[in-house]
């Protein structure tokens, strides 16, 4: 958050949006994330390092630890917890308690800047189109990977190519 904004700006925004029943996505860490969980965001997306830091640990490297931490975040209010794991893919604990794991496609890391945001965008596009968490995760992993494999953010063609190569469940 820029220094010119109050520390509770996310809370102020979510308080205003709450009556509209808006689905909110939060990609924040630490206290910012903790303070907005009470608003029951539709999706939060920490990476495995941020998730470990949130609980006072190092990076969470295995699925069991990630899922246990994701469950704690759900118990605090998050509806869906999407955890990006870089080359190890992603883990999603959905609001129905189902666990989804996707492997990352093969490719050469060129630039990881924006890959997490691309994953969120792909996930949301997939979910809004299909209402299916598995397909949303597949598109999210494809979009995040396609961005990581490019100098710039991925194009639709880049993402489609990754999907054709296959983004698979773990």
Question: Where on the chain are the PLM-derived regions?
Answer:
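Conserved phosphate-binding/catalytic region of the ribokinase-like
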Residues: 16-19, 34-35, 63-170
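Conserved beta-alpha-beta core of the PfkB/ribokinase-like small-molecule kinase fold
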Residues: 1-64
């Amino acid at each position: 958050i820029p220094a010119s904004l109050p520390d509770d700006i996310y809370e102020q925004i979510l308080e205003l949006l709450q009556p509209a029943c808006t689905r909110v996505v939060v990609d924040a860490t630490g206290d910012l994330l903790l303070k907005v969980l009470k608003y029951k965001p539709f999706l939060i997306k920490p990476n495995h390092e941020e998730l470990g830091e949130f609980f006072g640990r190092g990076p969470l490297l295995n699925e069991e630890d990630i899922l246990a931490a994701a469950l704690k975040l759900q118990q605090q209010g998050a509806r869906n917890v999407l955890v990006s794991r870089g080359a190890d893919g992603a883990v999603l604990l959905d609001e129905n308690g189902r666990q989804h794991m996707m492997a990352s496609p093969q490719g050469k890391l060129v630039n990881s800047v924006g890959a997490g945001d691309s994953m969120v965008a792909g996930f949301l596009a997939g979910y809004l189109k299909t209402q299916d968490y598995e397909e949303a995760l597949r598109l999210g992993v494809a979009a995040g990977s396609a961005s990581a494999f490019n100098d710039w953010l991925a194009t639709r063609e880049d993402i489609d190519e990754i999907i054709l190569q296959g983004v698979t469940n773990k």
